From Swiss-Prot:
InterPro entries named in the record: Rbsml_uS13_C, Ribosomal_uS13, Ribosomal_uS13-like_H2TH, Ribosomal_uS13_bac-type, Ribosomal_uS13_CS
Function of the protein: Located at the top of the head of the 30S subunit, it contacts several helices of the 16S rRNA. In the 70S ribosome it contacts the 23S rRNA (bridge B1a) and protein L5 of the 50S subunit (bridge B1b), connecting the 2 subunits; these bridges are implicated in subunit movement. Contacts the tRNAs in the A and P-sites.
Gene3D superfamilies in the cross-refs: 1.10.8.50, 30s ribosomal protein s13, domain 2
Keyword annotations: Ribonucleoprotein, Ribosomal protein, RNA-binding, rRNA-binding, tRNA-binding
Any single Gene Ontology cellular-component annotation: cytosol
Region (Disordered): 94-118
Quaternary structure (record): Part of the 30S ribosomal subunit. Forms a loose heterodimer with protein S19. Forms two bridges to the 50S subunit in the 70S ribosome.
PROSITE patterns: RIBOSOMAL_S13_1 (PS00646), RIBOSOMAL_S13_2 (PS50159)
Family: Belongs to the universal ribosomal protein uS13 family.
GO MF annotations, alphabetized: rRNA binding; structural constituent of ribosome; tRNA binding
GO BP term, pick one: translation
Record's protein name: Small ribosomal subunit protein uS13
Amino acid sequence: MARIAGINIPDQKHTVIALTAIYGIGLTRAQQICAATSIAEDAKIKELSEAQIDTLREEVAKYIVEGDLRREISMNIKRLMDLGCYRGLRHRRSLPLRGQRTKTNARTRKGPRKPIRK
């Protein structure tokens, strides 16, 4: 298995699909990486030479992926909560952020129902 950005990439999959195993790289970005490195999208990882895998590593290193991306996202959420803005308050209360209704729905975000005490 090839190791890119600290992740073991599946050998038997096509390059585009295998790159999506990295957190922060979706299908579109994987296609852009393949185009930039001039590697065929339908080539399997096990068919690539070591030099081609090195170019993939260099291209992926240009993007924020994996742990750095996770850390950046959590820091952005923490910043919103510290600011006390509307989105930060909604994060703090575990409610939907983007204007969805909460009277009847939003069970995933709010968690299981709590019984009403008498």
